[in-house]
Amino acid sequence: MAASATATVGTKGIVRQVIGPVLDVEFPAGKLPSILNALRIEGKNPAGQDVALTAEVQQLLGDHRVRAVAMSGTDGLVRGMEALDTGAPISVPVGEATLGRIFNVLGEPVDEQGDLKNVTTSPIHRSAPSLTDLETKPKVFETGIKVIDLLAPYRQGGKVGLFGGAGVGKTVLIQELINNIAKEHGGVSVFGGVGERTREGNDLYEEFKESGVINSEDLTKSKVALCFGQMNEPPGARMRVGLSALTMAEHFRDVNKQDVLLFIDNIFRFVQAGSEVSALLGRMPSAVGYQPTLGTDVGELQERITSTLEGSITSIQAVYVPADDLTDPAPATTFAHLDATTVLARALAAKGIYPAVDPLDSTSTMLQPSVVGDEHYRTARAVQSTLQRYKELQDIIAILGLDELSEEDRKTVDRARKIEKFLSQPFFVAEIFTGMSGKYVKLEDTIKGFNMILSGELDQLPEQAFYLVGSIDEVKAKAEKLASEAKA
């Protein structure tokens, strides 16, 4: 593996060709760097401009040349400049020193808080844990979000996909999860911003400072490290920043023996960057223009995200779905690695149901009686069958109206509408837009609430009382308030 390739450390090559973010470098015979080695180019070009960039070797071309992909812009780079072989892959800082800080793909701080002192570094390319080191006993990870905990529970040390098109609330849901995990579980999180908007990254950082997830006074008390390679970065940076974030998370798991949360927003941008790099390297594209190595690229990242006997990395990955098409190769390949999927539906967002998690499309391998228990399993399945029946009846209601339904079906529709409303929930991170305080709902309260709706105990309460509340006690309080307002 490239991590051990130190024989060529310090060898100097000459840049022979630059095409956008891809450069060809010629080295002395017998001194070629290994694939994945980092090359460092520093100096002044003939125009007197300072040039400083790192590139990663991707191909050995023959004629003593290698082809590398730059991790930053190649502006000012000219043929004839010297490139130094570092003899190892890109390495990033790891450990407590990373908490509360923002890094780029190379592990350089970009938050204007100064350089890191006496920090341990680790290469971003490494093998997945061996089979004998893996933890195989399933354990549910409580998030405090009703629709997730009840219908598509997350596995501790598992991989979760957040699927949805543009603007249906993936990033807000990720922010809420980081907030809940930090406050309720005292967990450490690593956030990998892969190819998303710079503004969102800045907003996220400011929100973390406001909520105390990042402690501005004492960074060591922060609960999250951030690693960003945003939309404006070259494809090389967007392709590798996910690995940089993962490397930081692995250190907390393997060395500190902690349970870690790794957020990747957005895993589709990782695939998209790989596709751009693949085309620049001259590889033949496969279906829909994606790279021929799509399965391998995704697999190398995903297989490192796992639970070991020492600790766990639970990963929550936002997956942008191009044109809302779940059969697109990028989301379809990602599906194969996931333990749970949280699918966000535009139709629910249009109705004002937030989080807009689709209760029928979202799935989890954890939702089985042997893992979650009989009561949880029965409640979840009853909720889904009620919602499914409501979905089937919608055409009849649209054509003939509610009055044409049987008494039993009318009851089902009434309860389904209450369930749909009760699956909404105010978020802590959305307080600024909604003016409503966020709610963290314990799993037992969630199960109790839905059982009461299904049993008919709450049939007399108005539908609106179930909208944007936490537990069932809040529903009752809201119903009383609505009744008193109606009288007034």
UniProtKB/Swiss-Prot annotation:
Single Gene Ontology MF annotation: ATP hydrolysis activity
A GO cellular component entry from the record: plasma membrane-derived thylakoid membrane
Domain of life per record: Bacteria
Keyword Translocase tagged: yes
SUPFAM superfamilies linked to this entry: C-terminal domain of alpha and beta subunits of F1 ATP synthase, N-terminal domain of alpha and beta subunits of F1 ATP synthase, P-loop containing nucleoside triphosphate hydrolases
Quaternary state and interactors: F-type ATPases have 2 components, CF(1) - the catalytic core - and CF(0) - the membrane proton channel. CF(1) has five subunits: alpha(3), beta(3), gamma(1), delta(1), epsilon(1). CF(0) has four main subunits: a(1), b(1), b'(1) and c(9-12).
Record function comment: Produces ATP from ADP in the presence of a proton gradient across the membrane. The catalytic sites are hosted primarily by the beta subunits.
PANTHER family noted in UniProt: ATP SYNTHASE (PTHR15184), ATP SYNTHASE SUBUNIT BETA, MITOCHONDRIAL (PTHR15184:SF71)
UniProt name for this protein: ATP synthase subunit beta
Species name: Prochlorococcus marinus (strain NATL1A)
